[in-house]
């Protein structure tokens, strides 16, 4: 903890500097600089507050120990002992919380995301389940105060989704949804099953951070643009003109389709933004093999036996196989109440990080 304490002392000094800068008229007048400073302050605020509470508790314990050592007032001594017992528990909890807050940050945690959901093994039932997952994430996003827009989708005749790509924007979206990557398995009786037998199907979910203002120039000659009619989930955005846009970056084979905006021009602009992000990610991965491996690791193959989570409808049960978490709340989870699952995953992976840091210390 000594090394962490030294870092915290430096962090507190920097935090105080930032607070002074935020009151500086010159900084306030520079909008870009001011936004950078306020973001840095917000990122540091919680850990600095906990560190200050930690130090205050330590000082209070030291004061109580003096009362105990003096021993002249038995009643005060007893009160000091009780206070110190409570403060020691609080300090222990603060230490754990501070360690987690000081873990290396995932640079993508603050980013918005593109989420791709695909029906995998199981035919029509897999496509219906893909639609259920789409609605689950839309409701969860709504609960978080995030915004969701459909980037591209392909529906099936039974009302499910062969694939759906959505953009979710808001506060720390990637940090919450990055653990949703993988194959999701459903066990239930399909509506088409007359014998009432439980079937197993899967859908895959891929979560990719959306890079902002990517510094990459794409040669227009290397991009094929196709336009077609929107065919989304229905509603007022669907029109009879060829407003949907599909862009293919020929050197990498990366394809982006966009149909959620109201005009072809808007779809072109958004598709180009996403394409730049994907191509940037590709080149950051250095080559096609690494890029493909990253995406495969994210979603798996969609095979029934390869799953991160199982949704068992007859038993109203959801099991996350990575952490051994089972909740008999499937109805609530499918209605977007994912916090309990996501919080458990976050704690699990943070604990693993702490263990790895301890081993390498």
From Swiss-Prot:
First-listed, main subcellular location of the protein, grouped into a coarse class: cytoplasm
Chain positions with N5-methylglutamine modification: 236
InterPro entries: PCRF (IPR005139), Pep_chain_release_fac_I (IPR000352), Pep_chain_release_fac_I_sf (IPR045853), Prokaryotic/Mito_RF (IPR050057), RF-1 (IPR004373)
Keyword Protein biosynthesis attached: yes
One Pfam family cited in the UniProt record for this chain: RF-1
Molecular function via GO: translation release factor activity, codon specific
GO CC annotations on file: cytoplasm
Posttranslational modification: Methylated by PrmC. Methylation increases the termination efficiency of RF1.
Xref: Gene3D superfamilies: 3.30.160.20, 3.30.70.1660, 6.10.140.1950
Compartment(s) where it occurs, according to its Swiss-Prot or TrEMBL record: Cytoplasm
The entry's keywords: Cytoplasm, Methylation, Protein biosynthesis
Matches recorded under SUPFAM superfamilies: Release factor (SSF75620)
Function: Peptide chain release factor 1 directs the termination of translation in response to the peptide chain termination codons UAG and UAA.
Family note: Belongs to the prokaryotic/mitochondrial release factor family.
The protein, known as: Peptide chain release factor 1
Organism name: Lactobacillus delbrueckii subsp. bulgaricus (strain ATCC 11842 / DSM 20081 / BCRC 10696 / JCM 1002 / NBRC 13953 / NCIMB 11778 / NCTC 12712 / WDCM 00102 / Lb 14)
Lineage, highest ranks first: Bacteria, Bacillati, Bacillota, Bacilli, Lactobacillales
Gene, per the UniProt record: prfA
């Amino acid at each position: 903890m000594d090394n962490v304490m030294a870092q915290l002392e430096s962090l507190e000094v920097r935090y105080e500097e930032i607070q002074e800068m935020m009151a500086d008229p010159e900084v306030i007048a520079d909008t870009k600089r001011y936004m950078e400073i306020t973001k840095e302050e917000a990122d540091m605020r919680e850990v600095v507050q906990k560190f200050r509470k930690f130090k205050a508790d330590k000082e209070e314990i030291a004061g109580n120990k003096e009362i105990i050592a003096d021993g002249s007032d038995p009643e005060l001594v007893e009160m000091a002992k009780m206070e110190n017992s409570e403060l020691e528990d609080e300090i222990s909890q603060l230490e754990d919380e501070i360690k987690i807050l000081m873990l290396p940050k995932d640079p993508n945690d603050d980013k918005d995301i593109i989420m791709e959901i695909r029906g995998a093994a199981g035919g029509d039932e897999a496509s219906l389940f893909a639609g259920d997952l789409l609605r689950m994430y839309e409701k969860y996003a709504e609960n978080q105060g995030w915004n969701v827009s459909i980037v591209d989708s392909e529906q099936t005749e039974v009302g499910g989704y062969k694939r759906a790509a959505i953009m979710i924007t808001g506060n720390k979206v990637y940090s919450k949804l990055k653990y949703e990557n993988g194959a999701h398995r459903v066990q239930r009786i399909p509506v088409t099953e007359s014998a009432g037998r439980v079937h197993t199907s899967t859908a895959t979910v891929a979560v990719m951070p959306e890079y902002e203002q990517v510094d990459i120039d794409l040669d227009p000659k290397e991009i094929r643009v196709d336009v077609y009619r929107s065919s989304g989930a229905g509603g007022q955005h669907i029109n009879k003109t060829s407003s949907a846009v599909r862009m293919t970056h020929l050197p990498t084979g990366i394809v982006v389709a966009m149909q959620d905006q109201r005009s072809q021009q808007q779809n072109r602009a958004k598709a180009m933004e996403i394409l730049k992000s994907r191509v940037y990610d590709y080149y950051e991965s250095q080559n096609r093999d690494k890029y493909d491996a990253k995406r495969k690791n994210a979603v798996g193959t969609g095979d029934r036996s390869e799953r991160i989570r199982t949704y068992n409808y007859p038993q109203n049960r959801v099991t996350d196989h990575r952490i051994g978490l089972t909740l008999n709340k499937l109805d609530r989870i499918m209605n977007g109440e994912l916090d309990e699952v996501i919080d458990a995953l976050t704690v699990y992976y943070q604990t693993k990080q702490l263990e790895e840091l301890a081993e390498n210390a």
